[in-house]
């Protein structure tokens, strides 16, 4: 019976393993293979004078990244990976890999990002790359468990829609029989509708689509968003929920993914609560102290401004009290100063991670705000209808999973945090 490589210890007497040939070395009287599965790497040592001829013949024909089965005696060897090796009694090539390889899984020869993504299945065999996606999986599992523990219902909303969430042109049109349709930018409208349904607290982890022409290290055209909406809550309530989630996820990864963090050479620090709350006007002042292209009140924050503020704050933080005119139509204005709204962004020192707000729950005010944005309320009738039949006060946010993983692991490019990225220039594989 096959053992995962991690389960083979120096105390194991014999073992059968199956995995990929990571490296092949020939030192005259000895041949060495490094065999890899998703749990680790083990050395297979072939003393040429002590193994059957058929094993030697098979060993000579093995190419890197071929899949092999090895059964043999385990010996404790201090200098070998994991302090043990296998001397084979059986060696079988299950699947042969062509040579040369499109890229070097052992990473002795580096590869450009495009080369890596063109052969992502092979790139993902690298222990370092695999560690990123084990951690990403841990992030989403921890977030799901945390939100369920807070009473949130996991929902699934349409990704093919008839209207834009926020208007604008950042839409992917698709052929949908005789109708006009688009890929959804956000589950925003649907999660608000579930507040009218009485679900009270919901979340979704799913894809979002933005037809942005950005081609940067932090933008994707298809991304994964963690969205939350809570009834009978204001912006402060959901900011607290968001920072609790961030701290919980970091803590979970630090405790449960130590091996993968070590592979990435990361000493993960868990953020401290509460995160600072910085008013938008103050954030502009902080940024303008150091950036060359100064911002005026009412401007959105540039990447340079985000970095400048992040350098000053040095930790996760919220930007709050945004000008109403530059936030989505559904953001609730302050009653006593309607030029500002109850919106916020969660920031990492490197970039924005999340955006949220208390939402408008009054039908007439919402229609007024939609019109003020130059949009047609008639186009949003399906969304507005629930607001006529008892919509509770509510608030929520959306959090980018790729950006969360990217900043957590200090990755240089957001494409490192998604298996098969979709950007302006990449549609395959």
Curated annotation (Swiss-Prot):
What are the names of the required cofactors?
Answer: Mg(2+)
Q: Which reaction does it catalyse?
A: tRNA(Asx) + L-aspartate + ATP = L-aspartyl-tRNA(Asx) + AMP + diphosphate
Q: Which InterPro entries match?
A: Aa-tRNA-synt_II (IPR004364), aa-tRNA-synth_II (IPR006195), aa-tRNA-synth_II/BPL/LPL (IPR045864), Asp-tRNA_synthase_2 (IPR004523), Asp/Asn-tRNA-synth_IIb (IPR002312), NA-bd_OB-fold (IPR012340), NA-bd_OB_tRNA (IPR004365)
**Name of one Pfam family that matches:** tRNA_anti-codon
Q: What is its EC number?
A: 6.1.1.23
The cofactor remark states:
Binds 3 Mg(2+) cations per subunit. The strongest magnesium site (Mg1) is bound to the beta- and gamma-phosphates of ATP and four water molecules complete its coordination sphere.
Q: List the residues marked with site Important for tRNA non-discrimination.
A: 81
Q: Where is this region: Aspartate?
A: 188-191
Q: Which GO terms describe its molecular function?
A: aspartate-tRNA ligase activity; aspartate-tRNA(Asn) ligase activity; ATP binding; magnesium ion binding; RNA binding
Q: Any idea which positions bind ATP?
A: 210-212, 218-220, 352, 400-403
Where is the major localization of this protein? cytoplasm
Family matches, as CDD domains: AsxRS_core (cd00776)
Q: Which residues bind L-aspartate?
A: 166, 210, 355, 359
Protein residues bound to Mg(2+) 2: 352, 355
A single GO BP term for this record reads:
aspartyl-tRNA aminoacylation
Family under the similarity heading: Belongs to the class-II aminoacyl-tRNA synthetase family. Type 2 subfamily.
Task: Tell me the function of this protein.
Answer: Aspartyl-tRNA synthetase with relaxed tRNA specificity since it is able to aspartylate not only its cognate tRNA(Asp) but also tRNA(Asn). Reaction proceeds in two steps: L-aspartate is first activated by ATP to form Asp-AMP and then transferred to the acceptor end of tRNA(Asp/Asn).
The UniProt subunit note reads as follows:
Homodimer.
Mind telling me what this protein is named?
A: Aspartate--tRNA(Asp/Asn) ligase
Organism source for this protein?
Methanoculleus marisnigri (strain ATCC 35101 / DSM 1498 / JR1)
Q: What taxonomic lineage is listed for the species of origin?
A: Archaea, Methanobacteriati, Methanobacteriota, Stenosarchaea group, Methanomicrobia
């Amino acid at each position: 019976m096959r053992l995962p490589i991690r389960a083979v210890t120096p105390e194991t007497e014999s073992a059968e393993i199956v995995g990929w040939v990571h490296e092949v070395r020939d030192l005259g009287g000895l041949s060495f293979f490094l065999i890899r599965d998703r749990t680790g790497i083990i050395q297979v040592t072939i003393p040429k004078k002590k193994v059957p001829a058929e094993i030697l013949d098979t060993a000579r024909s093995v190419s890197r990244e071929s899949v092999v089965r090895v059964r043999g005696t385990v010996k404790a060897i201090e200098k070998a990976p994991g302090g043990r090796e296998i001397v084979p009694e059986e060696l079988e090539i299950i699947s042969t890999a062509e040579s040369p390889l499109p890229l070097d899984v052992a990473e002795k020869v580096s590869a450009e990002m495009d080369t890596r993504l063109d052969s992502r299945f092979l790139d993902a065999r690298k222990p370092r790359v695999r560690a990123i996606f084990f951690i990403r999986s841990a992030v989403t599992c921890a977030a799901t468990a945390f939100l369920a523990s807070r009473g949130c219902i996991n929902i699934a909303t349409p990704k093919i829609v008839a209207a834009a969430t926020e208007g604008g042109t950042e839409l992917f049109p698709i052929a949908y029989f005789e109708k006009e349709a688009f890929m959804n930018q956000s589950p925003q409208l649907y999660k608000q509708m579930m507040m009218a349904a009485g679900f009270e607290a919901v979340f979704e982890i799913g894809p979002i689509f933005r037809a942005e022409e950005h081609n940067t290290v932090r933008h994707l055209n298809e991304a994964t968003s963690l969205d939350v909406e809570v009834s009978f809550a204001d912006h402060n309530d959901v900011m607290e929920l968001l920072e609790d989630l961030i701290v919980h996820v970091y803590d979970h990864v630090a405790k449960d993914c130590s091996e993968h963090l070590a592979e990435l050479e990361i000493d993960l620090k868990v953020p401290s609560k509460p995160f600072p709350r910085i008013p938008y006007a103050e954030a502009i002042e902080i940024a303008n102290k150091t950036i060359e292209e100064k911002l005026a009140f009412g401007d959105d924050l540039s990447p340079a401004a985000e970095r400048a503020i992040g350098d000053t704050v040095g930790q996760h933080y919220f930007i709050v009290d945004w000008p109403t005119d530059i936030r989505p139509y559904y953001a609730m204005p302050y009653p006593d100063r309607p030029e500002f709204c109850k919106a916020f962004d969660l920031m990492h020192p490197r970039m924005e991670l999340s955006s949220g707000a208390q939402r408008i729950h009054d039908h007439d005010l919402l229609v007024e705000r939609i019109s003020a944005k130059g949009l047609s309320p008639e186009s949003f009738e399906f969304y507005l209808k629930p607001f006529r039949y008892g919509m509770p006060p509510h608030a929520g946010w959306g959090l980018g999973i790729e950006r969360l993983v990217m900043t957590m692991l200090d990755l240089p490019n957001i494409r490192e945090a998604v298996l098969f990225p979709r950007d302006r220039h990449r549609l395959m594989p």
